[in-house]
Amino acid sequence: YPFAIDWAEQSHGRIIAPGLGIYFMSPKEKDWPLTDITRQLFFLRDIGMGHAYFRSKFFTDNTKGIYDFATDEYGTYPSLIPPMTWAKAASPQKPYNLTFTTQKDGTMRMTWQHQVKDTTMIPFNVYSPTSYPVDTKDARNLVAIRRQARSLLIPSEKGRHYAVTATDRYGNESLALQEAYTADT
């Protein structure tokens, strides 16, 4: 896939999302096997590029199992929109005042605040691994993305740690508000 390498090299720091012709898997088209697409997906991931499916009908119709593969094997973790730093480089202010309150049902309500009061302008990402400090670069730690509410119900689970970041409409993410909370403290 030399075209993808060239696109990545010539991107000038901008997002390039190659469109994968999944319609070619249709028997009415070229009847490609699923492995042709999965090979392209892994290659694009290896060189740090995203992708788009063309046409979405073949994705939602699960042609040759592409939807199952994408949800069960390839895209098992949430992902964030890459930041458009060429449009706006500054990150939003990080959230503050992270608190945990035990609910009657035993769950915890995690709440935070942010200087921007309009909840539609600054969505939040919540991370929760078992290690501290929370690694916000690891998508496996994401438990909620682009959340507009400033609270989240979480299980009362020992050994979990939490961090919250703010994002702007350009995908820029703030520094993390980290809390070394565990359910038994």
Q: Where do the language-model regions lie?
A:
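Active-site lining segments that contact anionic ligands and/or coordinate catalytic metals
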Residues: 13-15, 48, 107, 121, ...
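Beta-strand-rich modules
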Residues: 152-174
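Residue-level recognition of well-ordered beta-strand positions that form the cores
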Residues: 111-113, 127, 165
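Short beta-strand segments within Ig-like beta-sandwich modules, predominantly Fibronectin type-III
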Residues: 141-148
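Substrate-binding cleft of secreted/luminal carbohydrate-active enzymes
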Residues: 1-86
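Solvent-exposed loop/turn segments flanking beta-strands in beta-repeat/beta-sandwich domains
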Residues: 115-138
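Flexible, glycine-rich phosphate/dinucleotide-binding loops
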Residues: 25, 60, 133-135, 173
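Pro/Thr/Ser/Gly-rich low-complexity, intrinsically disordered linker/stalk tracts
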Residues: 68-120, 170-185
